[in-house]
Amino acid sequence: MTVATATRPLTALGAVLDAFERCASVRAVADRLPARGEVLRLGGLPGSSGAVLAGWLAGRLGAGRLVVVVATTPSDAERWLGDLQQLVGDGVALYPQREGLAEEEPHYEIAGERIETLEALLRGDLRVLVTTARASAERTAVPEALEALRFRIAVGEAYRITRVLGTL
């Protein structure tokens, strides 16, 4: 039976992370974990074992630390996201690339997902961020600009229809 801890939530595959931690080679990686601001690059893991490692790291590093997975393609990023959501549960998000669309013609679903991911990142809600190299290189609005783009509607408040339509 898998038990939720402060660093590892109860998920369907949480037992996989528990078993993973008992491997000798994983303990060797644990001894090499980088200090804040340093980087550790690992590769060569087949199938979903990379996601198991990333999920284990997210639990091991705990709150305030972020594991970033940079996938080669958008479909690889989606695969990583699905695997990590099953292993880690909440605290995993995808920062998608714009799929080759010009800045002037944004795809609104992708733009919305990017904003939601940035907001979760800034709130400290993420333990694992999945993205692509291309997405990480694309220009993105700074947090103040993201807040300026937000339009909140509350029950009982009056809004000019032109403002609502202009925002939409």
Where are these regions (language model features)?
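ASCE RecA-like P-loop NTPase motor cores
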Residues: M1-L168
